[in-house]
């Protein structure tokens, strides 16, 4: 900043004459009217349309056809106010809404002068949006309508995407009544938050206010957009967001790869690949030709996009938001790069656009915006002077006055560029203060923006929002607005007209059954429900069809289940169970049963191979129970170097009578040994193995019945949860825990009343000693005597203990004081002044503490005697103690003495 010399201050008088060019303006208006009357209306329309087609890349078009450009966007310099109409209005607007301060009037006068100069310099240019009537019908400068505000909600603190989406959802977009002309109003962002309806200029102003409050260098852009943009027509736009689809992991058994240490070398390839190579060359050549052709078509399409689709192609006014990255005034970290000289320099500013009606963020090359007329923030107003055919060609360095015309010279220091010689220093140059007397932008006249918690949670004006895209319909709902807790629904269609549905995605929140996502496929009539963790049955997802006879898959969180069940596949004649990380290494079970579900036909179990650290008696790979064939088949894991697996097949012998042991018959056992050198199992080992399998078979039958019962319970529970969904809320939710808060407040009030009641009543010394006799209506004389003595003895012991502690403290202080005095007297000449004064002060402190303890000891002794007598008298007068008359008289006489 240049130095400011106050001693050189000289009063500067400057007058702005609004009627200075009135004669010239009047002459120009008369010439335009005379030229318009000489030609008929049809020729005028044809000439204007041809001029537009010739200058389609330029922004110099008249905004209105019949009205002279000098009168478009004119600011009323009589500065009308609406005090009488809105001073006592029901809306309770602040005075800044319907009045104009002297600085505002000067600013409007400056803006009108700036507008007229720009119209004279560029007569064919579109009119500027400088000052529009607000909700109180008072013209306000657009820069002062921006009210930077930071909100307390985490979503609105720093994320540009979340802020843009919130504004698009919170405010209902209304297209301009006449998009060819300038907007006829610009209400404040504070009023817009209450009305929840606004046009593009009002929504852009609100969005910029929130972005600036969050620390982003945002500006409002006024320009020209395509028709579908100003109408917020999304029918030709594909669904822009990624589909949040929760996929369930399929259980895949671990497949052990065979060792690759010894591997046969492959045979040499003796086949000619000339034809394949030639085909690949032709394919690459065709791909290159296709790429070149596509590039030519793309360039032709870009040129065709510059043509006006109708006579109003370059005249539809619209407002959006631009964020200039690497802006000089931005508080965000700057982007740098290393130039050819090796110096680290600041990168040029770049921009991104935000559409306030949709919340979409795009680069400057997006085709929905055609022209940029002007931009503004809370500091200044900038007019685009660049000749451009596409918005992507614009340069966004606002300090360059060749590209951007500044309205107010009183800008922040970061936006100033001083033209000086190379040997001069800006910081050392002395400038007169009169040179800094530039007009700058004043503070906003808008009240501080506020969004209540209920409105923030509601988000949508009618608690729901529905948008139809190309081939998709997106519906969103406010939390707790739907009975089933639905917050979003996305339907994908097979055609662009959204008539043939394909897939429907439903998203839920705050459900007591913890369901969060449902996917329905129309072609297969399949449902898929996804749940969060925390259910009692550890349910993760369910896949089923509308027809209950078809396959159903139930996924579980295996870590929270005792049996480590991960997947259950239910079919009419079979049941498949997948496990994960079980101690017995079982990962697969399959039950085959009759359609009625009451008779087992076959059970197959598969086990993982035990590692070297696991203790496993039988390394079984597959165990099969064939109930109809009355057999048990055991297949063991492959041993080292074996090409096949060992198999043991038992034919179950007839069951013995009750109390008798099973008789083993080796003829009913078939054994296949993969390695003949392996030791042969003895009959005793086979007998024990058979007994284990028969015992486990009985366990399987009982387990099958329990599994079937659990399956029915799961599906019955889901049926009731879908029929009567219940929602839950947090105990910290201030909007929905009113009943709980009322209970807590009532308990707090009762506790406070109890404390006040206890404080107002005299102390009850006898209450703790009557607890053992609480079930008696009246105490006996012996019990009364015991309670009386216990109360007085406790009081006496308390006072004695307190006096003993004080006496001990006094003696310690006395001993320490004497020791310190003897030490000072003995070594008085060996201390310097500082240490000696410190020790003397310590001795004085000890004497002071000793006097304080002595005084407290005296007062405590006196008060203890008084309190003892008070308690004794109160006990004698207490009607709950049943003393004999002679004892009572004797005690009273002792008390009087």
UniProtKB/Swiss-Prot annotation:
One of its GO terms (cellular component) is cytoplasm. It holds the Pfam family DRC7_C. InterPro entries: DRC7/lobo, DRC7_C, MORN_DRC7, Papain-like_cys_pep_sf, Transglutaminase-like. Testis-specific (at protein level). It comes from the Eukaryota. The keyword Transport does not apply. Its main location: other. GO terms for biological process: flagellated sperm motility; sperm storage. It is found in: Cell projection, Cilium, Flagellum; Cytoplasm, Cytoskeleton, Cilium axoneme. Keywords: Cell projection, Cilium, Coiled coil, Cytoplasm, Cytoskeleton, Flagellum. Residues 40-49 have a biased composition (Acidic residues). Residues 27-49 are annotated as: Disordered. Residues 269-306, 801-858 form a coiled coil. Belongs to the DRC7 family. Key component of the nexin-dynein regulatory complex (N-DRC), essential for N-DRC integrity. Involved in the regulation of flagellar motility. Involved in sperm motility. Required for the sperm to enter in the coiled storage seminal receptacle (SR) tubule. This is Coiled-coil domain-containing protein lobo.
């Amino acid at each position: 900043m240049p130095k400011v010399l106050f001693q050189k201050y000289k009063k500067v008088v400057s007058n702005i004459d609004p009627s200075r060019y009135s004669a010239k303006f009047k002459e120009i208006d008369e010439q335009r009217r005379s030229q318009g009357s000489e030609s008929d209306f049809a020729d005028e329309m044809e000439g204007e349309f041809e001029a537009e087609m010739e200058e389609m890349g330029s922004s110099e078009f008249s905004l209105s056809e019949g009205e002279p450009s000098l009168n478009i966007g004119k600011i009323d310099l009589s500065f009308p106010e609406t005090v009488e109409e809105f001073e006592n209005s029901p809306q309770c607007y602040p005075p800044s809404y319907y009045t104009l301060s002297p600085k505002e009037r000067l600013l409007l006068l400056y803006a009108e002068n700036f507008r007229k100069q720009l119209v004279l310099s560029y007569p064919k240019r579109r009119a500027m949006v400088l000052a529009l009537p607000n909700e109180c019908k008072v013209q306000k400068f657009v820069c002062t309508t921006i009210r930077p505000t930071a909100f307390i909600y985490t979503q609105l603190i720093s994320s540009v995407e979340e802020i843009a989406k919130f504004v698009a959802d919170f405010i209902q977009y209304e297209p301009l009544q006449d998009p060819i002309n300038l907007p006829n109003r610009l209400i404040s962002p504070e009023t817009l938050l209450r009305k929840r309806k606004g046009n593009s200029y009002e929504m852009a102003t609100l969005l910029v206010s929130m972005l600036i409050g969050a620390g982003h260098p945002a500006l409002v852009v006024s320009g020209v957009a395509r028709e579908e943009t100003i109408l917020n027509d999304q029918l030709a736009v594909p669904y822009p967001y990624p589909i949040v689809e929760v996929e369930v992991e399929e259980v895949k058994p671990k497949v052990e790869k065979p060792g690759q240490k010894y591997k046969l070398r492959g045979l040499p390839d003796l086949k000619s690949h000339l034809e394949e190579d030639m085909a690949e060359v032709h394919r690459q050549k065709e791909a290159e030709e296709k790429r070149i052709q596509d590039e030519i078509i793309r360039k032709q399409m870009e040129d065709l996009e510059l043509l006006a689709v109708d006579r109003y192609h370059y005249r539809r006014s619209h407002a959006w938001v631009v964020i200039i990255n690497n802006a000089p005034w931005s508080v965000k970290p700057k982007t740098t790069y290393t130039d050819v000289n090796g110096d680290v320099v600041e990168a040029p500013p770049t921009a991104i656009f935000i559409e306030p009606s949709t919340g979409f963020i795009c680069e400057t090359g997006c085709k929905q915006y055609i022209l940029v007329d002007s931009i503004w923030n809370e500091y200044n107003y900038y007019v685009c002077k660049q000749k451009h055919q596409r918005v992507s060609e614009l340069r966004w360095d606002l300090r360059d006055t060749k590209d951007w015309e500044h309205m107010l010279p009183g800008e922040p220091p970061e936006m100033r560029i001083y033209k000086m010689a190379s040997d001069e220093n800006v910081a050392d140059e002395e400038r007169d203060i009169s040179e800094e007397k530039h007009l700058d932008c004043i503070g906003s006249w808008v009240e501080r923006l506020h969004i209540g918690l209920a409105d923030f949670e509601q988000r949508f004006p009618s608690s729901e929002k529905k948008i139809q895209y190309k081939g998709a319909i997106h519906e969103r709902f406010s939390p707790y607005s739907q009975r089933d807790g639905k917050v979003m629904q996305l339907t994908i269609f097979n055609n662009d007209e959204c008539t043939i549905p394909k897939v429907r995605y439903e998203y839920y929140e705050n459900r007591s059954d913890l369901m969060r996502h449902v996917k329905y496929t129309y072609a297969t009539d399949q449902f898929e429900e996804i749940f969060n963790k925390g259910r009692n049955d550890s349910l993760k997802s369910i896949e089923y069809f509308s027809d209950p006879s078809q396959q159903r898959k139930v996924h579980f969180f295996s870590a929270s289940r005792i049996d480590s069940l991960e997947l259950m596949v239910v079919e009419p004649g079979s049941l498949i169970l997948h496990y994960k990380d079980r101690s017995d290494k079982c990962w697969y079970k399959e039950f085959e049963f009759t359609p009625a579900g009451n008779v087992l036909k076959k059970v197959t179990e598969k086990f993982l191979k035990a590692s070297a650290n696991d203790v496993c008696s039988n390394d079984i790979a597959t165990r099969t129970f064939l109930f109809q064939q009355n057999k048990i088949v055991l297949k063991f894991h492959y041993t080292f170097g074996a090409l096949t697996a060992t198999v043991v097949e038992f034919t179950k012998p007839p069951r013995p009578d009750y109390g008798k042991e099973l008789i083993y018959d080796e003829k009913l056992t078939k054994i296949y040994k993969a390695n003949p050198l392996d030791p042969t199992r003895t009959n005793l080992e086979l007998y024990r193995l058979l007994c284990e399998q028969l015992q486990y078979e009985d366990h399987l039958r009982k387990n099958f019945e329990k599994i079937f019962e659990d399956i029915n319970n799961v599906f019955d529970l889901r049926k009731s949860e879908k029929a009567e969904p219940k929602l839950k809320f947090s105990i910290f939710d201030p909007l929905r825990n009113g009943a709980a808060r009322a209970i807590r407040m009532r308990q707090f009030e009762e506790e406070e009343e109890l404390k006040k009641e206890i404080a107002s009543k005299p102390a009850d010394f006898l209450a703790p000693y009557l607890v053992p006799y609480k079930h008696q209506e009246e105490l006996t004389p012996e019990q009364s005597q015991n309670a009386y003595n216990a109360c007085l003895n406790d009081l006496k012991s308390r006072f004695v203990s307190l006096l003993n502690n004080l006496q001990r403290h006094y003696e310690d202080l006395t001993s320490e004081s004497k020791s310190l005095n003897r030490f000072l007297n003995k070594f008085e000449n060996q201390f310097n002044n500082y240490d000696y004064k410190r020790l003397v002060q310590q001795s004085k402190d000890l004497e002071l503490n000793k006097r304080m303890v002595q005084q407290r000891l005296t007062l405590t002794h006196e008060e203890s005697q008084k309190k003892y007598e008070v308690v004794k008298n109160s006990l004698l007068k207490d009607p709950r103690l049943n003393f004999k008359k002679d004892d009572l008289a004797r005690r009273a006489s002792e008390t009087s003495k």
